Swiss-Prot record:
Tissue specificity as recorded in UniProt: Expressed strongly in colorectal cancer tissues compared to wild-type colon samples (at protein level). Expressed strongly in colorectal cancer tissues compared to wild-type colon samples.
Main localisation: nucleus
Function description: Positively stimulates PRMT1-induced protein arginine dimethylated arginine methylation.
Residue ranges that the Swiss-Prot or TrEMBL entry lists as coiled coil: none
Entries under InterPro entries matching the protein: FAM98
Protein name: Protein FAM98B
Gly residues bias: start-end ranges: 331-433
GO cellular component, one term: cytoplasm
């Protein structure tokens, strides 16, 4: 099975003709036979030379080139070839056969002449495309931000609205209007700029980053203040008198509230437009400033409010965690006699109680009361232990601890002490076994 037969291969003449038609060429070389014949004749063909001159002039009008191809060199072929060679070198022609070798032998072949036409026509096509893109970028949409800014300048300066959206042309009108206005005012009317240096691209980018960081910080602060404003105004409507006027408050407050924006409006343009008078510091409490900042709310006086205290010099110190230390006093409790009472207690505590009938109980120690009496059938109750108080025949009392009641023992009927509890000792008794 045979596939489709391949079509005719594209030729260089066909590429040149297609490019010339796209460029809008209206000369005599739009036919393939005429183009081939002119390429074979080279620079000696007037049609070929005219086409080269037309392509070179179109390229020069779109590009900033020093070299050019003019009609003045057609009479002298060597000069004409020098112009073409210099033009191709400035255009960075990739065909070495057109820019190197003996200049008299460069355009003698048909293929070399077609390469020259193809290079010039394609370069012209590329230049037209780039120029068209630049023109489209300058013809901005009338709804774009840049166009709105330029139109705002037109309104401020009193320039009639432009029918075109060509930004460079509109900026030229603004510049001429500003120069005309400045020529009619005093020399120092505008003042010297605060920023006296010219910024390069790197410095401008750095200032943009600084402005972005500050804008984020101020946006956070503005949002906080706006939220506080909302909460404050909302709290005014809590009273019964204000609840009936909710609609009136909203009608007055909402338009002013929506006019506040959390986004900052300071840009690089404000920095460039700042003048030296902006750096002057003026006190906000000066007389001239207060004339413009005074309002009726400054005359509203607050009533008397209760004193909430909280001053450091009025705060009382906390109470001590332990009692103050005092020196021990001399003197302690004595021992009781036969049937006698107990001795007096030491400093800070109660005295020990006397035992009944037997050899008496001992006195208490530091703050502690000793107890316990011996004798026939007499059982003394234990005393309360004070601060490290010690009974006579008993155990040691703890810190504020309480001595236990002694148990009855079995022993000597003449006052033998039984096993006591924590505080006072137990009394022995005359008991029957």
């Amino acid at each position: 099975m045979r596939g489709p037969e391949p079509g005719p291969q594209p030729t260089m003449e066909g590429d040149v003709l297609d490019t010339l038609e796209a460029l809008g060429y209206k000369g005599p070389l739009l036919e393939e036979q005429a183009l081939t014949k002119a390429a074979e004749g080279g620079l000696s063909s007037p049609e070929f030379s005219e086409l080269c001159i037309w392509l070179g002039s179109q390229i020069k009008s779109l590009c900033n080139l020093e070299e050019s191809i003019t009609s003045a060199g057609r009479d002298d072929l060597e000069s004409f070839q020098l112009e073409i060679s210099g033009f191709l070198k400035e255009m960075a022609c990739p065909y070495s056969v057109l820019i190197s070798g003996d200049i008299k032998d460069r355009l003698k072949k048909k293929e070399d002449c077609l390469k020259l036409l193809l290079f010039l026509s394609t370069e012209l096509q590329a230049s037209q495309i780039l120029q068209n893109k630049k023109h489209k970028n300058s013809q901005l949409d009338k709804n774009s931000e840049v166009y709105q800014e330029v139109q705002a300048m037109f309104d401020t300066l009193g320039i009639p609205k432009s029918t075109t959206s060509d930004i460079p042309h509109m900026l030229n009108q603004v510049e001429s209007k500003v120069k005309d206005i400045l020529s009619k005012v005093q020399k120092n009317h505008v003042g010297k700029p605060l920023l006296k240096m010219d910024l390069n691209s790197e410095q401008a980018e750095q200032l943009e980053r600084i402005n972005d960081a500050l804008s984020c910080e101020y946006e956070c602060r503005r949002r906080m203040l706006m939220k506080r404003l909302d909460v404050t105004v909302q709290s005014f409507g809590w009273s019964d008198r204000a609840k009936v006027k909710t609609d009136d408050i909203a009608r007055i407050y909402q338009p002013k509230r929506y006019a506040l924006s959390p986004k900052t409006t300071i840009t690089m343009a404000h920095l460039l437009a700042a003048r030296e008078d902006l750096s002057k510091i003026i006190r906000t409490s000066s007389g001239t400033s207060r004339e413009k900042t005074a309002c009726a709310i400054n005359k509203v006086l607050m009533g008397r409010v209760p004193d909430r205290g909280g001053r450091p010099n009025e705060i009382e110190p906390p109470p001590p965690e332990m009692p103050p230390w005092q020196k021990r006093q001399e003197g302690g409790g004595g021992r009781g006699g036969w049937g006698g009472g107990g001795g007096g207690g030491g400093r800070g505590g109660g005295g020990g109680g006397g035992g009944r009938g037997g050899w008496g109980g001992g006195g208490g120690g530091w703050g502690g009361g000793g107890g316990g009496g011996g004798g026939w059938g007499g059982g003394g109750g234990g005393g309360r232990g004070g601060f490290q108080g010690r009974g006579d025949y008993g155990g040691r009392g703890g810190y504020g601890g309480r001595g236990g009641y002694g148990g009855r023992g079995y022993g000597d009927p003449y006052g033998g002490g039984g096993g006591g509890g924590g505080g006072g000792g137990g009394g022995g008794g005359y008991r029957r076994y």
